[in-house]
Design a protein with these regions (language model features):
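Well-ordered mid-protein domain cores that form the structural environment of catalytic cofactors
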Residues: 94-148
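Conserved, structured C-terminal
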Residues: 3-43, 48-49, 124-383
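Acidic, proline/glycine-enriched N-terminal capping motif
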Residues: 2-106, 114-116
Length: 383
C-alpha cells in the first residue's frame, strides 16, 4: 500500500526478486534481504526501497536516526599536479576555495552549461580530489571527465573500492560517536576527516541528502557487514532503524533538494534550478560558463518552484502545470510530505508565474487540481 502511495518513476524503479541476477549489488545485499527489505531496480542496482515502511523510516530520520546503504553512489578520484585544474574546468563551483578536509556541492557541466550530473567534491589534498556522483551516472561522468583531461592528472573510476553508509537524523552524531575515537563535533557541516569507525579505516563526511544533520561514511567494501551491524547495534537504544530509497526520496523532497533526472538533467542549467549559488562565474572559464553568463544576462525562460496541493491529491512527475487552461510547465517531483502532512512537489514554470502565493492547477488524470506556489525548501531542520 505505502509503496504504491510513494511510487517512483517506472523508468527508475521496478520490484526485484532474489532471482534478479543482472543487477549490480552492494556488499550489503544479503543483509537487506535478511531484513525483509522490498528490493527495487534503481539505476541498474538492486537496492532496498523500504524495510518497515516509508512513513516509519521517514519519521525516524526526522526525529531520531536512520541508516542508509548508499554504496551504489559512485566515486571518482582525481590526483596529480593538474587535479585542481581539471576539477575547475568540468565543474561550476570554485574548488580553489576549498580547504583540505572540506567538501562542496557542485555541478558537472556540459559545454552548454547544463548538468552532466550533480556531485560532491571533497578536497583530500592540493593534488587529490574525490568526487561523489550519482549511481546511474558514474560511468558517463568518468568518461566526461577523462574526455576533458588535458591536465597532468590521473582520473580513476574508484567506485568499486568504496562502500558508503549514511547515518542521518538528530541522534545520528551521538550514535556514531559511540563507534569512533574521533571527536565528531570537530567535523563541521560539509567537512570530512579520516579516522576509524568500529576499528575500520573510514572517510567520515558531515554531509547528507535528507535535510537533517548526519554523516556519510566511506570505507572498503569488505567491512560493510561488520560496520552495518555495529552501527545498528549502537543505534538501537536511540531508535535508529534501517532506511531505504523510498524514505530517502521523501526526505530530500521535503528538504527541496534536486534529484538528477527530475529537477536537473542535461537540459537544465543551475540558474533555472535555483542553484545559482554553485555557479562561481568569477573563476577561470569552465565548461558552459559562456552560455551560463549569457543566460544570466538575457534572463530565464523557466524557474524551479515548490508547490503545495490544496487537497489530498498528488501532483506527480510529468503532470502538467496550468494557469487557467494554459499549460505553463511540468511537475518534476511530487508526493506526500510525511513530516509536514502535506502533498508537495516541484515544477518548472515561466518566471512570471513563479512568485510565492501564485495559484496554479495541476492536471491529474484529466482533472485540474488546485495548488499554490510556496517557498523552497519546504522543510528546514531546527537549529
Amino acid at each position: 500500500m505505502l509503496a504504491s502511495m510513494f511510487r517512483f518513476s517506472d523508468e527508475k524503479f521496478s520490484v526485484t526478486t532474489p532471482a534478479t541476477a543482472a543487477l549490480r549489488k552492494t556488499a550489503l545485499n544479503s543483509i537487506h534481504r535478511q531484513l525483509g527489505a522490498k528490493m527495487v531496480n534503481f539505476g541498474g542496482w538492486d537496492m532496498p526501497l523500504e524495510y518497515s515502511g516509508i512513513l516509519a523510516e521517514h519519521e525516524a530520520v526526522r526525529t531520531r536516526a536512520g541508516l542508509f546503504d548508499v554504496s551504489h553512489m559512485g566515486e571518482i578520484e582525481i590526483q596529480g599536479p593538474g587535479a585542481l585544474g581539471l576539477v575547475q574546468l568540468v565543474s561550476c563551483n570554485n574548488a580553489a576555495k576549498l580547504a583540505m578536509g572540506q567538501a562542496h556541492y557542485s555541478g558537472l557541466m556540459t559545454s552548454r552549461g547544463t548538468f552532466v550530473d550533480d556531485l560532491l567534491v571533497h578536497k583530500i589534498s592540493d593534488a587529490h580530489y574525490m568526487l561523489c556522483v550519482n549511481a546511474g551516472n558514474q560511468d558517463q561522468d568518468y568518461e566526461h571527465i577523462v574526455e576533458h583531461n588535458k591536465f597532468d592528472a590521473k582520473v580513476e573510476n574508484a567506485g568499486p573500492r568504496y562502500s558508503q553508509l549514511a547515518i542521518q537524523g538528530p541522534r545520528g552524531k551521538d550514535i556514531l560517536q559511540r563507534l569512533t575515537p574521533m571527536e565528531l563535533d570537530s567535523i563541521h557541516y560539509y567537512h570530512f576527516a579520516f579516522g576509524k569507525v568500529s576499528g575500520i579505516d573510514s572517510l567520515i563526511a558531515r554531509t547528507g541528502y535528507t535535510g537533517e544533520d548526519g554523516f556519510e561514511i566511506y570505507f572498503a567494501p569488505e567491512h560493510s557487514e561488520k560496520l552495518w551491524r555495529d552501527l545498528m547495534y549502537a543505534g538501537g537504544p536511540a531508535g535508529m532503524i534501517p532506511c531505504g530509497l523510498g524514505a530517502r526520496n521523501t526526505l530530500r523532497l521535503e528538504a527541496g533538494m534536486c534529484l538528477y533526472g527530475h529537477e536537473i538533467d542535461d537540459t537544465t542549467t543551475p540558474w533555472e534550478a535555483g542553484l545559482g549559488w554553485i555557479c562561481k562565474m568569477e573563476k577561470a572559464p569552465f565548461l558552459g560558463s559562456d552560455d551560463l553568463a549569457r543566460q544570466k544576462k538575457d534572463g530565464l525562460k523557466r524557474k524551479l518552484v515548490g508547490f503545495e496541493m490544496c487537497d489530498k491529491r498528488i501532483g506527480r512527475d510529468g503532470y502538467p502545470v496550468l494557469i487557467g487552461s494554459q499549460e505553463v510547465g511540468r511537475v518534476t517531483s511530487g508526493g506526500p510530505a510525511p513530516f509536514l502532512k502535506k502533498n508537495i512537489g516541484m515544477a518548472y514554470v515561466p518566471p512570471e508565474f513563479s512568485a510565492v502565493g501564485t495559484d496554479i492547477v495541476i492536471g491529474i488524470r484529466g482533472q485540474g487540481e488546485a495548488a499554490r506556489i510556496v517557498a523552497l525548501p519546504f522543510y528546514k531542520r531546527p537549529q
